[in-house]
Design a protein with these regions (language model features):
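Compact, glycine-rich, soluble single-domain proteins
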Residues: 1-73
């Protein structure tokens, strides 16, 4: 499986699993990123940090480390 960090701009993927523990995982889930949710990758900064995505109709910027914890398909 690949992570959200590996997804190219303009692609829509589905969240399959969240890695991480405790507060980090909770923060990602509080942003609306949960299993089964479609995520559209809008932009990736030149060095890969941050990644700009659209989730549930709103836009988010995720750190590279957070994007690596989100397994997608």
């Amino acid at each position: 499986m690949k992570t959200l960090r590996e997804v190219a701009c303009g692609q829509t993927v589905t969240v399959m699993r969240l890695h991480g523990e405790g507060p980090v995982k909770r923060r990602i889930m509080d942003m609306g990123i949960t299993k089964g949710v479609p995520v559209y990758v809008r932009k990736v900064a030149p060095l890969g940090d941050p990644v700009e995505v659209t989730v549930r109709g709103y836009e988010l910027s995720l750190r590279k480390a957070d994007a690596e914890m989100i397994e997608v398909e």
